[in-house]
Structure formats: C-alpha cells, structure tokens
From Swiss-Prot:
It comes from Staphylothermus marinus (strain ATCC 43588 / DSM 3639 / JCM 9404 / F1). Gene3D superfamilies: Nucleoside diphosphate kinase-like domain. It is found in: Cytoplasm. One of its GO terms (biological process) is UTP biosynthetic process. Major role in the synthesis of nucleoside triphosphates other than ATP. The ATP gamma phosphate is transferred to the NDP beta phosphate via a ping-pong mechanism, using a phosphorylated active-site intermediate. Keywords: ATP-binding, Cytoplasm, Kinase, Magnesium, Metal-binding, Nucleotide metabolism, Nucleotide-binding, Phosphoprotein, Transferase. This is Nucleoside diphosphate kinase. Its main location: cytoplasm. Its EC number is 2.7.4.6. The gene is ndk. Belongs to the NDK family.
C-alpha cells in the first residue's frame, strides 16, 4: 500500500452552490480518510502564495480574485495512492471536458470556476498543505 496525503479545496463556487456535503461524501465513500478539514476565506497574500506556480500567467489575477471572492473548504485526505485517486475523481481542469461521474463533470461548466482543487503531485501536496494548515490542525487517527 502507498499511503499518501493530498490537499483538496472546495472553491468559492462549490461553497456558494451548496456542494460541500456532496463532495466530501464522495471522498468518504471512496474510502479516503479526512485528516484535517476547515472553512476559511483566503487572503490575497495566502492565495498568491498558494498559486505561486501560476504567477505571471495570463489567468493569475482572475484566479486570485476568484479564490478570494468567498469562503472555501480545505481538507487533507489520506489513503492508498490518494493523489491520483482524487485527481481521477475530480476530473480534468476544464469542467466542460470532464466526464460525467467526476466532480467537475457533474458540477462545473467552465475552466475557471471548476468547483475543486486537488494537489497534482506529492511535492505539490506537501507545499500546499503547509500553506493552508498548521501541524496541530492535522489529526492522526
């Protein structure tokens, strides 16, 4: 077994549309363990730090504006190959191309407002978790 941790964000559009419970339930039904969970509102500084890999890209400013437009849900999920499992569950970035049955395929109609974010590699997961969570917010059980 290859136990991994990954970070998932339910973005402001997912929170506004009341999709929190549905999205969390999908991950739980898959057998992923929630190690940390909180609602927060990203500051501009925290959003820029989180999405620093996209700094300088044409969509960076609008991404930061969107991610700071309302509350988000942040969670750490753990399980066997959690990063790739979660990425398959959420579907491609562009919700218009995501197949039905994926979170984005079922709930997203665009590339920019695509309901969820999930870490794409072990390195990204470690960095993103450190940006959003303090060590004492992560529960081992």
């Amino acid at each position: 077994m290859n136990t991994e941790r990954t970070l998932v964000l339910i973005k402001p559009d997912g929170v506004r549309r009341g999709l929190i419970g549905e999205i969390i339930s999908r991950f739980e039904r898959k057998g992923l363990k929630i190690k940390a969970l909180k609602m927060l509102r990203l500051t501009r500084e925290k959003a820029e730090e989180f999405y620093s890999v996209h700094r300088g890209k044409p969509f960076f400013v609008s991404l930061i504006e969107f991610m700071t437009s309302g509350p988000i849900i942040a969670m750490i999920l753990e399980g066997d190959m959690a990063i790739s499992v979660v990425r398959r569950m959420i579907g491609p970035t562009d919700g218009r191309e995501a197949p039905p049955g994926t979170i984005r395929g079922d709930y997203s109609l665009s590339k920019s407002q695509n309901v969820v974010h999930a870490s794409d590699s072990p390195e990204s997961a470690m960095r993103e978790i450190r940006v959003i969570f303090k060590d004492d917010e992560i529960i081992d059980w």
